[in-house]
Amino acid sequence: SAQRRCAYAFALDQGYEGIVTIDGNDKDDPEAIPRFIEALKQGVDFVQASRFIAGGIAENTPKSRDFAIRFVHAPMLSLFSGFRWTDTTQGFRAYSRKMLLDTRIAPFRDVFVTYELLAYLSYRAPKLGYLCLELPTTRRYPKGEVPTKISSFKGNLSVLLVLFRACFGFYSTN
């Protein structure tokens, strides 16, 4: 999204060597942030939170979302990127400065309006040989009504279209 791109640009302009992002919806436990920073310090270029690997916790995840992530989104990005992802839809991530400034990735383009950048980076970074890692995290949905910006058939179809475009190189620079 434009907000993500602005945040990345600001952090890079300030000289930061890496960026950690976390969704502002209070579903992710920020206790994992120091592990994300440590992974960047150890040379990892892309750290992705995962509630589905050993040590991760998925609490009250809506069944339809759980199914879509485990059996559509993550497997498809894994197949096309060459890296085994398990949890590709959330924004709890960390990126190295080197990766974000790579002109072959070029994340500062106007084509990234909604969720495109999240899917694209999961596809493109491993394809270019960047060191990627998933770390276990906790993601808790509240009981009852699920707060989300993705709703209805139209919203889910949009996410699926973004996924296909990312996997088939639509957002790639070359």
Which residues make up each language-model segment?
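Acceptor/aglycone-binding surface of glycosyltransferases and processive sugar-polymer synthases
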Residues: 1-13, 30-111, 142-160
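Short beta-strand-to-loop acidic/aromatic patch adjacent to the donor-nucleotide binding site
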Residues: 16-27
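Residue-level detector of anion-binding/catalytic polar loops
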Residues: 17, 45, 131
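Short glycine/serine/threonine-enriched helix-capping/active-site loop
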Residues: 22, 47-50, 135-137
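Conserved beta-strand edge residues that scaffold enzyme active sites
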Residues: 25, 53, 138-140
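Catalytic donor-sugar/metal-binding loop of nucleotide-sugar-dependent glycosyltransferases
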Residues: 109-110, 122-139
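Acidic donor-binding loop at a coil-to-helix junction in glycosyltransferase catalytic cores
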Residues: 112-120
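C-terminal, non-catalytic tails of nucleotide-sugar-dependent glycosyltransferases
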Residues: 159-174
